């Protein structure tokens, strides 16, 4: 009889242990939602004046984004050192997205590309993405298509500049007025892919010797390529028509297009298939 009681007691203890383990694993993990935004900033939504005095307004700025990821890294990832993000946790946004950065008015929020739910809490302090050729849609065959109008001294040029090269941007923590990527239990956080188009055209409102202007091509080199106020070029045609120096400047600026706020990114140009 005593032996039976002992066996039953052991069985009850085991059942209780299994029950406790089951309850702990079912709802104990803290999770939240992580959103991915793309932002061309006010330069794209409002227009601006290039370093060489052209007033530029954008109708559409299409970027095609794939392989989008946010990572938790410790120590923090440094894009000035390597392209490799050594992460503890990685959250990928599935799919491919063509985003119009010029969409919305002056006060428009950054564009929501997508979100991932039930991600582990923590600080996602690194972001990476690829700017790849779109297979269809308004950016078909290109990774970036810039459409707008440039005006100076009574001359007006409707332009389309298309980029067929592909780039991978690996970025550290967002730098701006607020920190991003901090996911808390039950809450929503966001990370941002930022694009600095003043790096291409420069900015008349900052000094000529500012790094933004010294590294930018401006718009003046494009103007002579217009025919009856119309300009439509891609990188291949621009390589043939621009001076070697201007073309190399353009190529360099495209590699610096991707940011996280004011935070920098490491850029790899992707091989063409």
Q: Residue spans of the language-model regions?
A:
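A short, solvent-exposed, low-complexity linear motif enriched for acidic/polar residues
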Residues: 24-273
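Bacterial N-terminal signal peptides that target proteins for export
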Residues: 1-10
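C-terminal motif of bacterial Sec signal peptides marking the signal peptidase cleavage site
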Residues: 19-22
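Core hydrophobic alpha-helical transmembrane segments of single-pass membrane proteins
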Residues: 12-15
């Amino acid at each position: 009889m005593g032996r039976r009681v002992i066996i039953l007691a052991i069985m009850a203890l085991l059942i209780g242990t299994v029950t406790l383990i089951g309850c702990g694993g079912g709802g104990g993990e803290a999770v939240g939602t992580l959103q991915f935004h793309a932002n061309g900033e006010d330069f794209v939504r409002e227009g601006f004046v290039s370093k060489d005095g052209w007033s530029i307004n954008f109708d559409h700025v299409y970027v095609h984004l794939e392989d989008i990821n946010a990572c938790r890294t410790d120590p923090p990832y440094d894009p000035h050192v390597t392209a490799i993000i050594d992460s503890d946790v990685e959250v990928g946004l599935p799919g491919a997205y063509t985003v119009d950065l010029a969409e919305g008015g002056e006060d428009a929020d950054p564009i929501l590309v997508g979100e991932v739910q039930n991600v582990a809490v923590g600080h996602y302090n690194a972001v990476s993405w690829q700017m790849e050729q779109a297979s269809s849609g308004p950016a078909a065959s290109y990774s970036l298509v810039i459409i707008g109008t440039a005006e100076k001294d009574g001359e007006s040029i409707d332009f389309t500049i298309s980029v067929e090269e592909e780039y991978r941007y690996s970025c550290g923590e967002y730098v701006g007025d607020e920190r991003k990527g901090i996911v808390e239990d039950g809450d929503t956080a966001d990370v941002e892919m930022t694009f600095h188009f003043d790096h291409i055209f420069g900015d008349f409102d900052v000094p000529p010797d500012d790094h933004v202007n010294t590294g930018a091509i401006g718009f003046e080199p494009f103007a002579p390529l217009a025919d009856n106020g119309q300009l439509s070029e891609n990188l291949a045609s621009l390589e043939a028509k621009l001076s070697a120096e201007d073309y190399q400047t353009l190529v360099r600026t495209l590699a610096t297009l991707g940011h996280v706020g004011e935070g920098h990114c490491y850029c790899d140009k992707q091989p063409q298939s």
